[in-house]
């Protein structure tokens, strides 16, 4: 098949290149099975060079006016081959404007001798001149008559997600476009659900790829966790964020096999399951990609890791694949007993008896539906809303497709053939992006829906999947029926080249574009139009609705109320349209000359492909910078007054107060303190840096037998010789000072990630062997720490004002706390494995002069070296041990930073919601009026609603479910279920679904009245009581005048358009009037204490 046989399935795991003939090129699935039979999948990446006579598009001269709705500026931070990439969304631009920008002097490709020279310049200049990437644009550049390798219509088993579940995942089973320029990057990642991906470079400059064989993917993950501990602790699958860049030099240094390859225009790249890949663009170009699957992928999908820190990551329910294609393992899999062992060397099979049976049943079902539609076309009748659409048949588990909750009103009309309906879709409503007409097949042209009107899963509006709707029926010749794998005819073939993977998707939200403008384009790029299968949930917008409308959210029954979308979820000026249009029910129908409901309306659930959201902002200062300290703004209370009761000889807090340097040195006091610390989580005097004693004491008070959950036992006796998991990442010891390159990992940590706790026989200090740099097998009963071995009974740390704890010697023969050496950026362990000596000569004079906010009044003179809060340009300074005693939050950070420090001032700001005081009716508060200024006002109404968050089996979730919707438990009487409990609930379509309970949240909304009589409905987080300290942003906009806005921020029409219409249940839809119970409910909510408009 245009390739040489590379022997026993490519044992060297090199990237292979294939050149199929036109005949071989016709069957996509068959050719993928063939290249795997040659071992291409072992590299994680393969290149396919299509036949010269094949062209996906006749010309690219007509796309300059196409809009790139949300370009992403890629800001990269880091050094020494380890980088983090952040995204900043820019304004929309056309392809023509983007081309001119990419070719401008600032962004153009630098002069270079060859690709190797260009690669060196890429890694050398990665952090300079942030490029702009036009990524994740839903649509295709293929001509509609291209059948071979059409990225919009590959017809692989991934189509089961759409055909059986009715789920559309943009960029996963639909195509995405990517416009790149020099240095635009896709970071290390595997595909969502560890799927395959295909990438075609339509035109422009080449694209360089790096790939790691799937059998070595775990090694890359372990390396990334070591250098980015902050990210890994926040999310186990943090590489799915597509923010982590690791250079080939680092990969070579740590012995991780990888290959590289360059993709030229007109070439395909295919990535394989669990194949980590990364890369960059050489200049202006355009690529198109999507995901697909084979039979081999199913086992990968069952064990794929999921991002745990974001709700909108793609998750495909594997139920349909296992039930249909692995029926013999289905029951075991449902019970969690199907132990899958992945064999990365095994090639995929082209077909199976189960797949053939499913394909045949789809063809049979389609034929029956076509016959029925012809009969119905000759006898049109008006359908009843309550009648079922039709019974679905077939082995895939057919079900009745009903009207979704009766929430879409449709006019009567003749019924049509579903195929006609697919070919001649209904025109789009006014205001929606309409770029052309798209035929069935996803990659071909059909009417489009503005992305701003699509519902993102992160908004919480995706309901569970409907019973499988037999909705999407391809033509007879398009129905995929795989043929047996025939012996290939080998030609002069695949050269094992060096590189390759596929661009990482980014966050794109297209703006609304007038339909007239786009209709003038010969071949516009077209996003997809799909139908959401259930009523959308209305979001409350405090500034766009009246008080009466706001409280309707609580009065009406049904799980449809939702908290306002946070500003962080909205990524551009077009998001107002996103709020108003998201989650609506749409029906696509056409009947003869008029618009009418079709019995075979196509219902789809839509999900977005995982994109790289701005999970954080780039750091505002370098790791070694010192912020100039301000005079009085940093005042903090001392963590311990020094007057604590010391009657309890084993109490930790009073013992700590005895360790100040201004007290007389007492070795016995240090012994007592170390012994008490050894019985307190995390039981290691060094790990406590990231788990302070105040946190451990609070945990013991609330739950005496609670453990840290990191392998630490929960009992209180001595932990010496027990193995637990250290909390200090190895990178904290290897970075700092002049260390600009990562160093080898510590060999004193076991393969299971644990290390034994060891205790000093003299001072009772307890540490992990790995944290203190001691070879475990050398520890005996009489082991002593470095300080006791040197008989330095009066030793104290030169960087802080507290005694006790784990000490090591410095290069100038002084002593230093290990935790101080870790947290002070310029300190450096010369022998990383043994954790000593410590070089502190690089600490700048400015750091020695910083004053600790906790001990500067206690100590007569400034001593030691302080660290500072990591929040932007905060100048709050403290000694490491003072901050640790005060409970300042310190966490592992990502390279090249070591420790992330959050002072109490910024920590409380981040958790302000938990500290909000209760607000009562009649209370005078301060809140923002429509004109953007803050005024005093009186609370005249209050309402609260408890909502549950649940996860459904198909990967969708709801975070605004009413307790009454759960049928398996009386939540009103018994309260919420326990976390993780499986519950049964009734959804808005009237059907019962099973889901997993996640959490319960109670939301509060208040109606306030300003001095001029105007009223507003606000959330609790937007209210400030007179007793609270007002944030600076509020104080600067606080007005003592009347709260009347100078001019309305929104006209009546704008406010009406901004509020999403609530889609009620069938009963609510039929009765448009207000019941007496509802009126009484609202009146009770709006009871006013005091006369409205009375002076405050």
Swiss-Prot record:
The lineage of its organism: Eukaryota, Metazoa, Chordata, Craniata, Vertebrata. Residues 917-974, 975-1031 form the Tudor domain. Residues 430-443 have a biased composition (Basic and acidic residues). The modification N6-acetyllysine is found at residue 602. Belongs to the JHDM3 histone demethylase family. Its cofactor is Fe(2+). A zinc finger (C2HC pre-PHD-type) spans 794-827. It comes from Homo sapiens (Human). 2-oxoglutarate binds at residues 133, 199, 207, 242. Histone demethylase that specifically demethylates 'Lys-9' of histone H3, thereby playing a role in histone code. Does not demethylate histone H3 'Lys-4', H3 'Lys-27', H3 'Lys-36' nor H4 'Lys-20'. Only able to demethylate trimethylated H3 'Lys-9', with a weaker activity than KDM4A, KDM4C and KDM4D. Demethylation of Lys residue generates formaldehyde and succinate. Plays a critical role in the development of the central nervous system (CNS). Residues 369-382, 444-458 have a biased composition (Basic residues). The keyword Nucleus applies. This is Lysine-specific demethylase 4B.
């Amino acid at each position: 098949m245009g390739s040489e046989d590379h022997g026993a399935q490519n044992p060297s795991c090199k990237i292979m290149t294939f050149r199929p003939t036109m005949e071989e090129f016709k069957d996509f699935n068959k050719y993928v099975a063939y290249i795997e039979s040659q071992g291409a999948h072992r590299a994680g990446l393969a290149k396919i060079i299509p036949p010269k006579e094949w062209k996906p598009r006749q010309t690219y001269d007509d796309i300059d006016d196409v809009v790139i709705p949300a370009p992403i500026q890629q800001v990269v931070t880091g050094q020494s081959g380890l980088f983090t990439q952040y995204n900043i969304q820019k304004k929309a631009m056309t392809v023509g404007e983007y081309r001119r920008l990419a070719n401008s002097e600032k962004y153009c490709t630098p002069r270079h001798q060859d690709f190797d020279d260009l690669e060196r310049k890429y890694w050398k200049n990665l952090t300079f001149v942030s490029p702009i990437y036009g990524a994740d644009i839903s649509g295709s550049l293929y001509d509609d008559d291209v059948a071979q390798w059409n990225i919009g219509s590959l017809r692989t088993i991934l189509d089961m997600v759409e055909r059986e579940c009715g789920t559309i995942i943009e960029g996963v089973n639909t195509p995405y476009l990517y416009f790149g320029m020099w240095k635009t990057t896709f970071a290390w990642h595997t595909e969502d659900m560890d799927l395959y991906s295909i990438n075609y470079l339509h035109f422009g400059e080449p694209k360089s790829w790096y790939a790691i064989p799937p059998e070595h993917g775990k090694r890359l993950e372990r390396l990334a966790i070591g250098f980015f501990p902050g990210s890994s602790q926040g999310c186990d699958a943090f590489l799915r964020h597509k923010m982590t860049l690791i250079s080939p030099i680092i990969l070579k240094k740590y012995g991780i096999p990888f290959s590289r390859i360059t993709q030229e225009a007109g070439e395909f790249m295919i990535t394989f399951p669990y194949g980590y890949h990364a890369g960059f663009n050489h200049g202006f170009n355009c690529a198109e990609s999507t995901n697909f699957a084979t039979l081999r992928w199913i086992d990968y999908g069952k064990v794929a890791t999921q991002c745990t820190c974001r709700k909108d990551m793609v998750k495909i329910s594997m139920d349909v694949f296992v039930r249909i294609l692995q029926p013999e393992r289905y029951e075991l899999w449902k019970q969690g007993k199907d132990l899958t062992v992945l064999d990365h060397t095994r090639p995929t099979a082209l077909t199976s008896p189960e797949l053939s049976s499913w394909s045949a049943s789809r063809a049979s079902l389609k034929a029956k539906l076509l016959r029925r539609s012809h009969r119905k076309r000759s006898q049109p009748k008006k359908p009843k809303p309550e009648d079922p659409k039709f019974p679905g048949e077939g082995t895939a588990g057919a079900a009745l497709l009903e009207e979704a909750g009766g929430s879409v009103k449709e006019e009567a009309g003749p019924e049509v053939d579903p195929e006609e309906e697919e070919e001649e879709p209904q025109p789009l409503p006014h205001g929606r992006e309409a770029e052309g007409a798209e035929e069935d097949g996803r990659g071909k042209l059909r009417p489009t829906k503005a992305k701003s009107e699509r519902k993102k899963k992160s908004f919480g509006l995706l309901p569970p999947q409907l019973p499988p709707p037999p909705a999407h029926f391809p033509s007879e010749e398009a129905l995929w029926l795989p043929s047996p794998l025939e012996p290939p005819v080998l030609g002069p073939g695949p050269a094992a080249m060096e590189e390759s993977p596929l661009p990482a998707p980014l966050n794109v939200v297209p703006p609304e574009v007038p339909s007239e403008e786009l209709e003038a384009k010969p071949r516009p790029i077209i996003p997809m139009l799909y139908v959401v299968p259930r009523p959308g949930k209305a979001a409350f917008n405090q500034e766009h609705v009246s008080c009466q409308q706001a409280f309707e959210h609580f009065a009406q029954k049904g799980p449809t109320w939702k908290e306002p979308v946070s500003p962080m979820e909205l990524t551009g000026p077009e998001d107002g349209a996103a709020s108003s249009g998201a989650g609506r029910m749409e029906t696509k129908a056409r009947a003869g000359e008029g618009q009418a409901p079709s019995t075979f309306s196509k219902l789809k659930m839509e999900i977005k492909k995982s994109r790289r959201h701005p999970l954080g902002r780039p750091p505002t200062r370098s790791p070694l910078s010192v912020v100039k300290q301000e005079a009085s703004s940093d005042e903090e209370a001392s963590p311990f007054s020094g007057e604590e009761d010391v009657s309890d000889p084993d109490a930790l807090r009073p013992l700590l107060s005895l360790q100040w340097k201004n007290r007389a040195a007492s070795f016995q006091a240090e012994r007592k303190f170390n012994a008490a610390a050894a019985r307190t989580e995390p039981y290691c005097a060094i790990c406590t840096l990231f788990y302070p004693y105040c946190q451990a004491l609070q945990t013991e008070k609330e739950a005496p037998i609670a453990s840290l959950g990191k392998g630490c036992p929960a009992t209180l006796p001595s932990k010496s010789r027990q193995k637990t998991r250290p909390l200090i990442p190895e990178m904290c010891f290897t970075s700092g000072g002049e260390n600009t390159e990562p160093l080898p990992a510590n060999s004193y940590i076991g393969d299971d990630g644990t290390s034994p706790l060891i205790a000093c026989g003299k001072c009772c200090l307890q540490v992990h062997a790995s944290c203190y740099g001691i070879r475990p097998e050398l520890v005996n009963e009489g082991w002593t720490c470095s300080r006791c071995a040197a008989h330095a009974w009066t030793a104290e740390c030169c960087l802080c004002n507290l005694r006790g704890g784990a000490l090591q010697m410095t290069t100038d023969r002084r002593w230093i706390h290990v935790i101080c050496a870790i947290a002070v950026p310029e300190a450096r362990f010369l022998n990383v494995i043994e954790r000593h000596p410590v070089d502190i000569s690089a600490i700048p004079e400015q750091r020695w002069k910083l004053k600790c906010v906790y001990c500067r009044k206690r100590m007569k003179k400034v001593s030691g070296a302080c660290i500072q809060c990591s929040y932007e340009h905060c100048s709050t300074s403290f000694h490491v041990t003072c901050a640790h005693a005060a409970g300042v939050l310190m966490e592992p950070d990502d390279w090249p930073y070591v420790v992330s420090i959050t002072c109490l001032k910024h920590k409380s700001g981040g958790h302000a919601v938990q500290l909000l005081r209760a607000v009562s009716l009649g209370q005078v508060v301060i809140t923002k009026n429509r004109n953007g200024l803050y005024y005093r006002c009186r609370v005249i109404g209050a309402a609260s609603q408890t909502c549950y968050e649940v996860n459904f089996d198909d990967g969708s979730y709801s975070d605004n479910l009413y307790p009454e919707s759960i049928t398996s438990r009386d939540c009103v009487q018994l309260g919420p279920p326990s976390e993780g409990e499986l519950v049964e609930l009734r959804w808005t379509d009237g059907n019962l679904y099973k889901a997993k309970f996640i959490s319960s949240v109670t939301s509060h909304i208040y109606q306030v009245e300003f001095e001029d009589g105007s009223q507003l409905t606000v959330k609790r987080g937007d209210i400030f009581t007179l007793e609270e300290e007002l944030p600076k942003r509020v104080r600067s906009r606080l007005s003592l005048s009347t709260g009347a806005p100078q001019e309305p921020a929104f006209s009546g029409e704008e406010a009406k358009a901004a509020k999403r219409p609530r889609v009620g249940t069938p009963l609510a839809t039929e009765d448009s009037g207000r019941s007496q119970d509802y009126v009484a409910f609202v009146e009770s909510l709006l009871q006013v204490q005091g006369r409205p408009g009375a002076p405050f």
